[in-house]
Amino acid sequence: MGYGEGDISLISFHSVSNGYYGECGRRGGYMEVTGFNSEVRKQVYKVASLSACSNISGQILMSLVMNPPKVGDESYTSYREERDDIILSLSQCAEAMVQTFNSLEGVTCSKAEGAMFVFPSVRLPKKAIGAAEAMNTKPDVFYALRLLESTGIAVLPGSVFGQVPGTWHFRCTILQSEEKVQLIVYRFKSFHEAFMEEFRD
C-alpha cells in the first residue's frame, strides 16, 4: 500500500491511552491518511487543525512511541522485554475474558484483535427488558448498572455506541492485571448467573 491517490483509501488512528502502552489518561495520538486526493486531505487537515494539540507530556509520549529504543541502544533490551510482557499479559487477559463471556448463558463475545476492549453481546430475558423499560432505562444500561451495584465492575453499555435495535452489548476493558482479571471474571460470572435466574422468562 502506498500513499498515492490510486491506492486504497485508509485513515488510521493510534493513541497512547488506547495502545498497548496502556497510558490511560494521557493524551497523545496520531492519524495517518493515505489514498485520498489532495482536496480530501486538505479538508481532513483543516478539521484536525480545529482541535488543540496535545499537552507537552502527550507530545513527549508520542515522540517515544514513534521512536522507541532500537537494537544497539542501551535501553533496547529492557524496552523489548517490557513491551513483550505487556502484550503477552493483555493477550492472556483478553483470552480469559472472552472464554468466560462465551461460557455464560446468552452471551457471545468475539476474540479481541488489537483492541483494549471486548464487546460481548447479551441476549437479555424479556423480564429484564420489561424491568428496564419500567424504569425508563435502556436494557443494556439496566444490566450495566446492576452489574456495577452488585460487583463494582464498570462496563459501558453498547447503546452509547449505537447498536441494532433489540440487541444488547457492553464494552469491557482488558487493561487490568492478570490477577485482577481472575477476580473480575469470577465476580462477573456469579453476577450474570444470578441476573439470568432472577429475570428468567
Enumerate the predicted regions with their spans.
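PLP-dependent class I/II
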Residues: 1-201
